[in-house]
A protein has these predicted regions:
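Elongated, mostly alpha-helical coiled-coil "stalk/stator" tethers of large membrane protein machines
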Residues: 1-177
Length: 177
C-alpha cells in the first residue's frame, strides 16, 4: 500500500506543479486527509464497499467542487474508481514528503531531556540546516531519560549526543580496561 500511495502522490505532485501549485494542492489534499481523520462517519462512507462508487463520487463533487482545484477533485474521483480512496491519508503524507524534498526541507526529530527555549530551538534548527544541507524543521520531543544533550534523527541517520549515551560509552570503556 505504501508504494501505491507513493505512486499516486507522485502523480498528484506532477499535477500540482503543472497547475495551481504545490501550496494549493497540498492544502487541498491535507484538508481531505484531516477530514478523514476527524470524521469517522465520512471515512466509513468513503471507504466502505457497501456504498456505490457513484454515490461516493456525487458526495465528493458536492462537497469539494468549487472548494478545491478541479484536477484535485478529479484525482479523488479516480481514487474512488480504482478503489484506492482508503489510501488518501497516506497519499497526503507522501505528497507532503515530496513537496518537502522538492523545496529542500527536512523534518528532523530532536529528543532532549528538558524543553528548549525559542533561542535554543532556532540555534538547533540553524546547525541542523548547515549539517544536512537542507532547511531543517525540528520536531522536539522531551524525554527525561536522555539526561542531557540531544538525540537527532534525520531520516535513517541518528546523531546521539546525549549524556546517557556518553555515560554508557564510558561504562563500556571502563569494563574493557
Amino acid at each position: 500500500d505504501e508504494t501505491v500511495a507513493r505512486n499516486y502522490a507522485e502523480t498528484l505532485f506532477e499535477l500540482a506543479r503543472k497547475h495551481e501549485g504545490l501550496d494549493v494542492y497540498g492544502a487541498g489534499i491535507g484538508t481531505i486527509a484531516s477530514l478523514l481523520d476527524a470524521d469517522p462517519k465520512f471515512r466509513l462512507f468513503l471507504e466502505t464497499p457497501r456504498i456505490a462508487e457513484a454515490d461516493k463520487k456525487a458526495v465528493v463533487r458536492k462537497v469539494f467542487e468549487g472548494e478545491l482545484p478541479r484536477q484535485l477533485v478529479n484525482f479523488i474521483l479516480i481514487t474512488i474508481d480504482k478503489r484506492r480512496q482508503r489510501l488518501l491519508r497516506d497519499i497526503a503524507r507522501e505528497f507532503d514528503a515530496l513537496v518537502d524534498d522538492h523545496l529542500g526541507r527536512a523534518h528532523v526529530e530532536v529528543t532532549v531531556a528538558r524543553p528548549l527555549d525559542d533561542t535554543t530551538k532556532d540555534l538547533v534548527a540553524r546547525r541542523l540546516t548547515a549539517l544536512l544541507g537542507k532547511t531543517a524543521i525540528p520536531h522536539v520531543r522531551v524525554r527525561p531519560e536522555v539526561l542531557g544533550g540531544m538525540i537527532v534523527r534525520a531520516g535513517d541517520t541518528i546523531y546521539d549526543g546525549s549524556v546517557r549515551r556518553r555515560l554508557e560509552d564510558m561504562r563500556r570503556q571502563l569494563l574493557r580496561a
